[in-house]
A protein has these predicted regions:
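Serine endopeptidase catalytic core focused on the charge-relay Asp
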Residues: 104
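Sec-dependent N-terminal signal peptides
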Residues: 4-14
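Sec/Tat signal peptide C-region and signal peptidase I cleavage site
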Residues: 16-20
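Exported/periplasmic ABC-transporter solute-binding proteins
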Residues: 21-47, 60, 64-65, 70, ...
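Acidic, polar ligand-binding/catalytic clefts
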Residues: 73-99
Length: 264
């Protein structure tokens, strides 16, 4: 009995709650699927001392999760929504982490879209010819970027929903599979396409790194709103990911002998 009481007493003397040592990154799926986290996070000094978990969902869902205090750090790619998150007090620090670009994927035997002079030209051709186009339609950063192109054309692809405009409601990988299976077109971030294995007869038909730049922002979630978050550990990881050391690692990360992300 005395041993049991001693054990209970000892447990209560432990100064730090184990759960407070766990860090949760709410992330867009494209960074997780690119393999970046498995490459980058183990290089963090305290990687073996703190359990770091990555939850990968669409940008919209990642932001909602962070608003609900379910995450220490947010890494997404929709600057408008990131700034809105900050303005509402959900975040305390924001850092432009890295960037890559979007590309338009389609059948290798395409004789039309590949001649496009701009992304709006490509989307206009798809709309006019009613080529099958797969949209993620999941409030992700990629989906938001796709919708922005349609808005620039003052077009509403939703009128063709279920006909030529196919809304998957899924992540990048499953959506790419659908586009390939249907011999259709799809707007994707480059890293997801590089890692995608079921390319079959599909390839990049339009690309322009400046026109289709895809910025990833990192936000430190406001610990004053979320008492469950350990600010010390969160800040340290945030600062390391913002450092020149981490930036150099990101620059060196490659898939299929190609750089995946870039630093401004």
């Amino acid at each position: 009995m005395r041993k049991i009481l001693y054990l209970i007493f000892f447990i209560f003397l432990i100064p730090i709650n184990v759960s407070s040592e766990n860090l949760l990154i709410q992330s867009t799926t494209s960074t997780r699927d690119s393999g970046l986290y498995k490459y980058l996070l183990p290089k963090y000094t305290y990687y073996n001392d703190i359990k770091i978990k990555v939850i990968a969902v669409g940008t919209g869902q990642a932001i909602k999760n962070a608003e609900n205090c379910d995450g220490n750090i947010l890494i997404v790619h929709d600057k408008g929504r990131e700034l809105d998150f900050m303005s509402k007090g959900y975040g305390v620090k924001r850092h432009e982490l890295m960037y890559n670009d979007y590309v338009l994927i389609g059948p290798s035997n395409d004789q039309d879209i590949s001649k496009s002079k701009s992304i709006t030209d490509a989307f206009s051709r798809i709309h006019d010819k009613k080529y099958k186009f797969v949209s993620r339609s999941d409030s992700s950063g990629t989906h938001s970027a796709e919708l922005a192109v349609w808005r620039r054309l003052s077009l509403n692809p939703g009128t063709g929903s279920g006909k030529w405009y196919l809304e998957s409601g899924q992540g990048m990988g499953p959506s790419l599979n659908i586009a390939v299976a249907l011999n259709g077109y799809i707007f994707s971030d480059r890293s997801s396409w590089l890692r995608f294995k079921n390319k079959r007869n599909h390839k990049i038909l339009y690309e322009n790194k400046q026109e289709l730049k895809n910025n990833y922002g990192m936000i430190l979630v406001n610990h004053n709103r979320c008492s469950n978050l350990n600010y010390k550990y969160s800040l340290d990881l945030f600062n390391w990911l913002s450092s020149d050391e981490a930036a150099n690692h990101i620059r060196k990360y490659r898939l299929n002998n190609q750089n995946v992300f870039y630093i401004d």
